[in-house]
């Protein structure tokens, strides 16, 4: 079995570190979510910061076939990154409470900013430690 080649410094730590050491270069991000063109913000220091990764894009394009969110209740987006899944769920179902959770402070900042830019009031952004123990969850992505 071959050993995995290490990533360059700082590349994979965004998955596990609240405050990664990689430079946080933020930039505008134009993206289409839930049929709306949105002007958001992203960073080089989060997963798939330059746009939708292929798997997320496929999921969002096929929600009606694989994972339609509930129309109300609470959906948790675990590992929200810059927010594409949380924002899509919130846009599709304004009556849904969306709780976006990420270990990365940068990802949480981006998701909160992007929810604000999209005019969404039904997105709550939390660190894993902030999630209430008694949170009733109807769906998790």
Residue locations for each model-derived region?
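Conserved SAM-binding loop and adjacent beta-strand
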Residues: 44-64
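Conserved SAM/SAH cofactor-binding pocket of Class I
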Residues: 58-133, 137-141
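Glycine-centered flexibility sites
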Residues: 35, 45, 55, 79-83
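Generic secondary-structure boundary/loop-capping signal
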Residues: 43-44, 49, 82, 128
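Generic detector of intrinsically disordered, low-complexity, polar/charged segments
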Residues: 1, 7, 32, 70, ...
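N-terminal auxiliary segments of SAM/dcSAM-dependent transferases
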Residues: 2-36, 44-49
């Amino acid at each position: 079995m071959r050993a995995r080649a290490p990533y360059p410094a700082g590349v994979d730590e965004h998955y596990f570190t609240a405050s990664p050491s990689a430079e946080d270069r933020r930039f505008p991000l134009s993206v289409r979510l839930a049929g709306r063109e949105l002007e958001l913000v992203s960073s080089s220091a989060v997963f798939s910061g330059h746009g939708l990764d292929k798997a997320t894009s496929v999921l969002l394009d096929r929600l009606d076939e694989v994972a339609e969110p509930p129309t109300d209740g609470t959906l948790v987006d675990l590992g929200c990154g810059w927010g594409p899944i949380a924002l899509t769920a919130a846009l599709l179902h304004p009556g849904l409470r969306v709780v976006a959770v990420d270990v990365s402070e940068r990802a949480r900042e981006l998701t909160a900013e992007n929810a604000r830019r999209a005019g969404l009031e039904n997105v709550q952004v939390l660190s894993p430690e902030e999630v209430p123990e008694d949170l009733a969850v109807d769906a998790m992505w």
